[in-house]
Structure formats: C-alpha cells, structure tokens
C-alpha cells in the first residue's frame, strides 16, 4: 500500500481522494525541515502547498518518495533539480487558481476605482461623504498588467468588456 504525507493545511477533500483509492494518508502540518527529514523516508508521496519547502536535504532522506504534488501553480518551494536527480516526479496545478485570482484582482481594481472600502467604512460610521466617495469609471482607462501568464491574460480578458486599453 502506498503512503502519502500531506504537510500543509488544505481541504480534507485531498486526503479523502487518496483514501478512496486505498492510499494511506497522514496529515501532519507545521513540520520543521528536520522533522520532515526524520519522517519522509516512510512516504511514497508528498502533497504540499506553500508552507513546506522541499529542500535537497529532505529529498536526500526521501528514499521511498516517488512523487511530490504541489497544490498550487508554482513549484518554487521544491528543489525540482534534486527531485529529478532522485527520480521523483514533481507535479503542480497550473491554472487551477487562474480564474479566481484574476477575478479577485479585477474586484480589487473596481473597489479601488469606486472607493468601496472608504465608502463602506464611513457609512458604517454613520457618515455620508458623497463627494469623497465618488469614484471613477473603468471605461476608457489604461490598465498595466505586469506578467502576462495565465492570470494576467485572464484579467485582460475580464476587463476587455469595459473598453480598457491594456498594457502588458
């Protein structure tokens, strides 16, 4: 039977998916590098998010490890070169958060343009500052997007309906 360690906090759906396939799962979060080095030899798989950094030292101790899965877009917290050298497959979920992140960025842009946080704060204090909360329209504005990967491209698409000039 395979054994997987989930070393970062995430939905319990993750361990349920493994359990449904007959894979034993341990969820142990908040491990130091040394603690992970001490227990990693017993695992065939490792599931991380952002809190765990998978170093060369951890991989050197991971004698049974076959795969590392990163529940997220990047793998900058995993020593991919050392993993490859050890025959460990590294996988991630590129695009998994693209739409949610682009929509969140769009919501923040709209909130800033329309002064929504300030309007919310002052009206909750019982104040009505009509002139101070007057926002501006997004239409006919220029939006600079730094980084035009999946998220930047999706954000560009979202603002396209607002007649925005996008600079990349």
Q: How does the language model describe each region?
A:
Residues 1, 65, 139-142:
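Phosphate-coordination loops involved in phosphoryl transfer and adenosine-cofactor binding
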Residues 1-43:
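N-terminal glycine-/charge-rich "phosphate-binding" loop or analogous flexible N-terminal tail
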Residues 6, 26, 45-121, 135:
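Phosphate/diphosphate ligand-binding glycine-rich loop within oxidoreductases
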Residues 16, 37-38, 56, 60, ...:
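Alpha-helical segments flanking ligand/cofactor-binding loops in enzyme cores
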Residues 17, 104, 108, 154, ...:
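Rossmann-fold NAD(P)-dependent oxidoreductase module
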Residues 122-130:
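A short, charged, Gly/Pro-tolerant segment at domain boundaries
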Residues 131-168:
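Rossmann-like dinucleotide/phosphate-binding beta-alpha-beta segment
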